[in-house]
C-alpha cells in the first residue's frame, strides 16, 4: 500500500511534515502496541505486537528524516531515487563535492578544528537549502528533480558525518 507510513500516523502524504505531531502520534502508537503489554497474551498476539512495533519504528525513522521521507514519497510515485538515472550529479554539484572533499582532507590532515567547524557549518547550510529545494520540487510535483535532490542530500549527510568524525 502506497504511503502506508503516513496512514499509520494519520498524516497527509506530503514532504512538509509537522514533526511535533509525528512525535506525538509515534509515542501513542508505540505505547499501544509495546511488546510488554502483550506479555500475558498468546504467542501469536505477542508476535503480532512485535511486528507492529517494528513497523511503527521503521515508519517513524523514515518519516522523521527528511531525505528518507522524500525517497519514500518518490517510491509512491514509482520513482527510485537510487536508480542509475538519478545517480548522475550536475557538473556544478560535482565540482562543489570535490571542493568540499578537498577542504575536508586539508582540514583533517592539518588537524584544523576551526576549518572543520567552518566546513560543517557550510554543509549544514547546504542541507537546509536542499530541504527548501525539495519542498519546492514536491509542491510543484517535480519528482525527477526531487530524486536528484535526494541523492545530493544523501551525499551531504554522509559528508557531514565524515566531518563530525574528524572533529576532536
How should these model regions be labeled?
Residues 1-168:
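C-terminal accessory/regulatory regions appended to core domains
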Amino acid at each position: 500500500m502506497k504511503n502506508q507510513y503516513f496512514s499509520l500516523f494519520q498524516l497527509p502524504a506530503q514532504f512538509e511534515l509537522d514533526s511535533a505531531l509525528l512525535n506525538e502520534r509515534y509515542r501513542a502508537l508505540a505505547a499501544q502496541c509495546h511488546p510488554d503489554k502483550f506479555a500475558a497474551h498468546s504467542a501469536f498476539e505477542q508476535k503480532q505486537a512485535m511486528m507492529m512495533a517494528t513497523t511503527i519504528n521503521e515508519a517513524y525513522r523514515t518519516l522523521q528524516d527528511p531525505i528518507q521521507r522524500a525517497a519514500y514519497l518518490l517510491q509512491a510515485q514509482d520513482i527510485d531515487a537510487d536508480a542509475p538515472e538519478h545517480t548522475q550529479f550536475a557538473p556544478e554539484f560535482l565540482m562543489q563535492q570535490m571542493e568540499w572533499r578537498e577542504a575536508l582532507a586539508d582540514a583533517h590532515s592539518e588537524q584544523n578544528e576551526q576549518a572543520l567547524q567552518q566546513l560543517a557549518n557550510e554543509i549544514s547550510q547546504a542541507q537546509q537549502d536542499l530541504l527548501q529545494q525539495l519542498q519546492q520540487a514536491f509542491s510543484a510535483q517535480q519528482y525527477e528533480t526531487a530524486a536528484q535532490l535526494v541523492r545530493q542530500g544523501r551525499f551531504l549527510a554522509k559528508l557531514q558525518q565524515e566531518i563530525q568524525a574528524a572533529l576532536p
